Amino acid sequence: MDRLKDKVALITGGVAGIGLGIAECYIREGAKVVLTANHNVDGGKRAVEKFGDDKSLFVQMNVADEGDWQDTIQKTIDKFGKLDILVNNAGVGGVNGPVESLSLKDWQQTIDINLTGNFLGEKYAIQAMKKYSNAKGSIINISSVAGLVGLPLSPAYSASKGGTRLLTHATALSLAQQKVDIRVNSVHPGWIATDIVPKEYEKQIVSTIPVGHMGEPVDIGEICIYLGSDESKFANGAEFVIDGAQRA
């Protein structure tokens, strides 16, 4: 139960759904966690009460805001003294519809949160890891199977998740070529049973999944334990698809 002992992880969108599942797995394995949310402040307070003030910190932040990133990283260092792991998990589904009907405002909001937020996270996490963690660490970008194939009625979401996939590749290669021991990988969930899945469509969704059921947040948490731990020291610039064989 100590695979992440003494590690400090920052998990955006970490107070509900997949993010909370990752946080629960990280706490179980001995990590200290900094959790963020833009709107769900009550969820953040509940998470800290559950995990303990000595092991967790909640920071309200907008991942698309550069100043919020600087503030959150500083609060992480002030509380725990270093940063070992960044999980870029926060995201939105965006507005559905064909590309010709999508407004620029709706497009930009999805890109700002899902892609620009990940860029800002990488930028400031790398700086902190270099300064406070001996230039060593792990960055995990939560993309989606929609980052591997296009969804016809979710063009902004698909673009943001595909962009996250290639941002992961570019950053991993850049750091490796610099001989900096900060690994960057992406995780691509399929359908995961969270509150955002419409109940009326559950049967239809499950019928498309070869294993016969949706995944759970813990399924993403477990792969993130591996990627955050020293066990994955040779995993870099890789894509981990967790979708019950849906895209096989």
Q: What does each model-identified segment do?
A:
Residues G97-V99, S103-I111, I205:
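Substrate-binding pocket helix/loop in short-chain dehydrogenase/reductase
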Residues Q127, L173-Q177, K233:
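Alpha-helical segment proximal to the catalytic Tyr-Lys
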Residues V8, V15-G17:
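Conserved glycine-rich cofactor-binding loop
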Residues E122, S160, T168:
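Active-site helix of classical SDR
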Residues A176-R183, A235-G237:
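Short, small/polar-rich loop/turn modules that mediate ligand/substrate recognition or access, typified
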Residues S144:
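Residue(s) in the substrate-gating loop at a strand-loop-helix junction
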Residues G93-N96, V149, V211, I225, ...:
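Short C-terminal tail/terminal secondary-structure segment
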